[in-house]
Design a protein with these regions (language model features):
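Hydrophobic alpha-helical bundle architecture
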Residues: 5, 28-36, 230-312, 316
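Residue-level marker of positions within ordered structural domains that often coincide
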Residues: 158, 214, 287
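Signature of multi-pass transmembrane helix bundles
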Residues: 5-211, 220-231, 320-384
Length: 384
């Protein structure tokens, strides 16, 4: 299968283009589809097109051609349109109507779930920003301090396990005159710096993007909402929400990995940083806004477990164990686990069934919403 997939890899970019066009078509007919978002996160579009191309080409060998690319484009374009649409209301609540964007990433279903479940776990008033730590622990209220300490512990353990010699062979910047302890400390601080730069820049990014997109959408796609990278949401949450999500998600992943070891799983998953950080930080941001610190801790922890266990099943079902595994983001350890089974056993009718099932979701959203406000939610209210 891998050789055939390699020969057909060029179809991935065709699938990506078709997915984007299909997303636009669904928006043009939004009166009927009830969809409002256009996914614009380029690297995510590439990852998703590549993954779904593998699924379809693996289980339906007869579609390793242009028709397979069309099937993949429609399938992934529908997913991108439908599940980014699910994040409109949660993001509008998070930004108090100021954002003018939705999320277009790999945990859109998780964000919707967090927004629904978090109020049942905790209280919004118990937000991370309202926590008062006693005595010297108050310094951890500053996200720079808390993130630096957490990353020092997290990266420190990993680097100590790998060993100084291995790290020197891996990193050319690790000079012979630098002590191993100082090297670990500097890397932890570097991560903190990068995170703060990311958080500081997101509002500027969102403001520029939404204004630019508005100029285009007013002419071509009136009322369309841009679905962008999940990191843009971090600027609308307490800074420590990101750190809490990362830490609790890591605990969940490590617990699940330990379970795989204890029960001698035929598939072993290694924690991947992208799902570990971006999925769980995003879940914590939305969970904290709706259910406070308790939800921001519990939901990323559960997500970490699902990422590992769902990823292990996906890697096994999709025959990827020998080829490096699975990227393990929440939606691809849940939604596309189900899609994989359906396509595996139902073939082409399975692809059609998945598309139809996803297109039903916005119809249910619309039926349960305030219909007068449905197409105005997510539109930016005011300038920053």
């Amino acid at each position: 299968a891998l050789e055939n997939i390699g020969l057909s890899a060029a179809w991935t970019m065709t699938s990506l283009l078709l997915a984007f066009i299909w997303n636009i078509i669904l928006l043009i007919f939004r009166k009927f589809t009830k969809l409002r978002t256009l996914l614009l996160t380029g690297h995510i579009m590439v990852q998703q097109a590549t993954t779904v191309t593998w699924i379809v080409f693996l289980f339906i060998p007869g579609l390793r051609n242009i028709w397979g690319a069309v099937a993949v484009g429609i399938l992934i374009g529908t997913y991108q349109a439908v599940f980014s649409n699910l994040t409109v209301e949660p993001t509008d609540r998070l930004t108090d109507g100021e954002g003018g964007f939705a999320i277009g990433h790999q945990q859109m279903f998780a964000i919707w779930l967090a927004d629904k479940i978090a109020p049942k776990i905790g209280k919004k008033e118990d937000s991370i920003e309202n926590i008062k730590l006693p005595g010297f622990l108050q310094m951890f209220s500053d996200n720079v301090v808390s993130t630096s300490v957490l990353m020092f512990i997290f990266f420190g353990i990993i680097m100590l396990v790998l060993g100084e010699d291995f790290m020197r062979s891996l990193d050319d910047t690790f000079s012979q005159t630098t002590a191993f302890g100082f090297y670990i400390f500097s890397k932890a601080l570097s991560f903190t710096v990068y995170l703060n730069v990311l958080q500081a820049g997101v509002r500027m990014f969102v403001a520029e993007l939404t204004e630019s997109f508005k100029g285009i959408s007013d002419k071509l796609l009136p009322g369309a909402i841009p679905a962008v990278d999940c990191a843009v949401a971090y600027g609308f949450a307490p800074a420590n929400a990101v750190t809490v999500g990362f830490f609790c998600g890591a605990l969940g992943q490590f617990l699940a990995i330990a379970g795989l070891l204890i029960f001698h799983s035929p598939v072993m998953i290694i924690a991947g940083f992208v799902p570990l950080f971006f999925d769980n930080a995003s879940i914590a941001v939305y969970a904290n806004h709706r259910g406070g610190v308790k939800a921001a801790m519990i939901l990323p922890f559960i997500s970490g477990i699902i990422q590992v266990l769902g990823g292990a099943v996906c890697a096994y079902v999709l025959q990827l164990v020998a080829f490096g595994g699975w990227h393990g983001n929440f939606d691809f350890s849940t939604i596309f686990l189900a899609v994989s089974y359906i396509v595996k056993y139902l073939k082409i009718p399975g692809v059609i069934l998945c598309v139809i099932a996803m297109l039903v979701i916005p119809q249910i959203q619309y039926a349960k919403s305030d219909k007068e406000k449905y197409f105005t939610v997510g539109q930016k209210d005011d300038e920053y």
